[in-house]
Amino acid sequence: MVAGSPKTSKKTLPDLSYEDRIEGVVFGVDEVGRGPLAGPVMAGAVYLHREHIPEGINDSKKLTARRRHLLSDMLHNQADYATGMADVHEIDRINIRQASLLAMKRAVEALIQKIGREPDCILVDGRDIPDWPWPSLPIIKGDSLSLSIAAASIVAKVERDEIMVKASQEYPGYGWEHNMGYPTKEHREAIQRLKPTKFHRRSFSPIRQFYENVD
């Protein structure tokens, strides 16, 4: 683990304070989709190039869908990134925490393969670090502090949303095209009315309770 962290501030946007303390190649990693009742958990890994950093990068949750798509397109052209996913079956088998870490590891491995070198440090959103050999620094609320992590949250969110919108066409009625699988009132009521799909997480309470009541 890499020691040390910049002092906290009242800044409104993430910056390179953490990245500037580290020499060499720095990846930012974040995941999205821990809370939904349906769909995969997705992680992004981003290597920003200092001379080409899009303006306006922020925690994906603080951006509109339109802004996220715009920034994702810009990152596609101006940075190196990759995504990793753990599907519903993996979530149910190993639990959502472990599945999130697995998705992060897959994203990092994909980015290493893409750029042809390993990172000197990985900045990870949250408290947990996946089981990998690279020096890492966990940062609580990292997607609001580190540009690299914020960028990772954007690419992961955009890709996961696209998966959910596509899935909503196969399984209409659950509102996935706008709730992205999260437990909204509409989604919960649809589960009771239409029954869960193979895209739902059976280990999550509302889905598990549905099958317990059926049995």
Swiss-Prot record:
GO process annotations (BP): DNA replication, removal of RNA primer; mismatch repair
EC number: 3.1.26.4
Gene3D superfamilies in the record: Ribonuclease H-like superfamily/Ribonuclease H (3.30.420.10)
Family in the record: Belongs to the RNase HII family.
Role description: Endonuclease that specifically degrades the RNA of RNA-DNA hybrids.
Top-level taxon of the source organism: Bacteria
Co-factor binding details: Manganese or magnesium. Binds 1 divalent metal ion per monomer in the absence of substrate. May bind a second metal ion after substrate binding.
Gene Ontology MF annotations: manganese ion binding; RNA binding; RNA-DNA hybrid ribonuclease activity
Assigned GO CC terms: cytoplasm; ribonuclease H2 complex
Organism: Zymomonas mobilis subsp. mobilis (strain ATCC 31821 / ZM4 / CP4)
Cofactors, names only: Mn(2+); Mg(2+)
Coiled-coil regions listed in the entry: none
Descriptive protein name: Ribonuclease HII
Catalytic activity annotation: Endonucleolytic cleavage to 5'-phosphomonoester
Subcellular location: Cytoplasm
CDD domains: RNase_HII_bacteria_HII_like
Keywords of this entry: Cytoplasm, Endonuclease, Hydrolase, Manganese, Metal-binding, Nuclease
